[in-house]
């Protein structure tokens, strides 16, 4: 079967494993976008460490789960989010102002909405987690 959206598949696997109470989840294939998204999630403590397993094909990622993640998902298509519209997107996607992050891809790399606001960057919305 052909994978249409690798990031969506990976986040759905993480979501399902978290709901089942698993401690680890195996994601394949590996991509740079998935690694950067997981790095943002790890920086905020929603997942534990993750390890990239190179198998001379597409690669795999083993993610350690902490049980803190409620939901994560992809926004498809990747809508444009100028700096002044990021607030509107966070209100639509996140349950409250206190927690959760919207992940954007900007000219400065993949980052959460707070870092993008600090750096005064807009971009395209990849997904969210809380």
Swiss-Prot record:
Top-level taxonomic group: Eukaryota
Q: Which Pfam families match?
A: Ribosomal_S8
GO CC terms for this protein? Answer: cytosolic small ribosomal subunit
Report keywords, A-Z: Ribonucleoprotein, Ribosomal protein
Single GO MF annotation: structural constituent of ribosome
Q: Which GO terms describe its biological process?
A: cytoplasmic translation
Instruction: Tell me where the signal peptide lies.
Output: none
UniProt record similarity statement: Belongs to the universal ribosomal protein uS8 family.
**NCBIfam families annotated for this entry?**
PRK04034.1 (NF003115)
Q: What is this protein called?
A: Small ribosomal subunit protein uS8B
């Amino acid at each position: 079967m052909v994978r249409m959206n690798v990031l969506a598949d990976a986040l759905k696997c993480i979501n399902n494993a978290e709901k089942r109470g698993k401690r680890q989840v195996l994601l394949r294939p590996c991509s740079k976008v998935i690694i950067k998204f997981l790095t943002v999630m790890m920086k905020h403590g929603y997942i534990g460490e993750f390890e990239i397993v190179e198998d001379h094909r597409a690669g795999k990622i083993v993610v350690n789960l902490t049980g803190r993640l409620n939901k994560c998902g992809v926004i498809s298509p990747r809508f444009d989010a100028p700096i002044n519209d990021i607030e509107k997107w966070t209100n639509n996607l996140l349950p409250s102002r206190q927690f959760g992050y919207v992940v954007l891809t900007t000219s400065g790399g993949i980052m959460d909405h707070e870092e993008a606001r600090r750096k005064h960057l807009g971009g395209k919305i990849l997904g969210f987690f809380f």
